[in-house]
Amino acid sequence: MSHRDTLFSAPIARLGDWTFDERVAEVFPDMIQRSVPGYSNIISMIGMLAERFVQPGTQVYDLGCSLGAATLSVRRNIHHDNCKIIAIDNSPAMIERCRRHIDAYKAPTPVDVIEGDIRDIAIENASMVVLNFTLQFLEPSERQALLDKIYQGLNPGGALVLSEKFSFEDAKVGELLFNMHHDFKRANGYSELEISQKRSMLENVMLTDSVETHKARLHQAGFEHSELWFQCFNFGSLVALKAEDAA
């Protein structure tokens, strides 16, 4: 059962850096719905993309799976035999709850839920890979290597879905979308104190990139095609395609 997010409703003397611990896992569904504009749309559309890209006898990777929302969306839309989903997260609290969520929804496609570091996982025989608000928590110097590994592990014609919070090269646009995002959180019941304290905890942990930076990395990894398919304020999602004739 999910609870309402009140983690930062009272002043916290020593905030520290953000961690996906048991307290966060307990309120995560409420937190992300009230904090990330368009999150439900992204999750449902990931399922539609899976229906288009997942092929028989292949694997799907959900890297940084949290509670398994994207995994479940993919699973509901796989209509082929001999497919498998591999869902990975490095948070024990998230993985424990993810396993419960996956087990609660029976479907023919098996799911391996793994507690581990996505940087250490081999990507093999993949028709689709999902990075749903995950890359932004890696050190910027480590992001290209992960995208390179994903590209190498994707089969020709495969797809990567990359959802992120964005920064903007145009400072005026960045300020507008930043403020609109804060308006969104206020409209969803978060106080100024809650918004401020959460931002302080995240600022050294979640380091955002521009869409242009993401596209440049994807191109360097080998993806011939990439485009922003969804955006709401400073949050969005790209899809990157490996050519069908790729070696």
Swiss-Prot record:
Its EC number is 2.1.3.-. S-adenosyl-L-methionine binds at residues 39, 64-66, 89-90, 117-118, 132, 199. GO terms for molecular function: carboxyl- or carbamoyltransferase activity; S-adenosyl-L-methionine binding. Pfam families: Methyltransf_25. Keywords: S-adenosyl-L-methionine, Transferase. It catalyses: prephenate + S-adenosyl-L-methionine = carboxy-S-adenosyl-L-methionine + 3-phenylpyruvate + H2O. CDD domains: AdoMet_MTases. InterPro entries: CmoA, Methyltransf_25, SAM-dependent_MTases_sf. One of its GO terms (biological process) is tRNA wobble uridine modification. PANTHER family: CARBOXY-S-ADENOSYL-L-METHIONINE SYNTHASE (PTHR43861:SF2), TRANS-ACONITATE 2-METHYLTRANSFERASE-RELATED (PTHR43861). HAMAP family: Cx_SAM_synthase. NCBIfam families: carboxy-S-adenosyl-L-methionine synthase CmoA, PRK15451.1. Belongs to the class I-like SAM-binding methyltransferase superfamily. Cx-SAM synthase family. Catalyzes the conversion of S-adenosyl-L-methionine (SAM) to carboxy-S-adenosyl-L-methionine (Cx-SAM). Homodimer. This is Carboxy-S-adenosyl-L-methionine synthase. It comes from Escherichia fergusonii (strain ATCC 35469 / DSM 13698 / CCUG 18766 / IAM 14443 / JCM 21226 / LMG 7866 / NBRC 102419 / NCTC 12128 / CDC 0568-73).
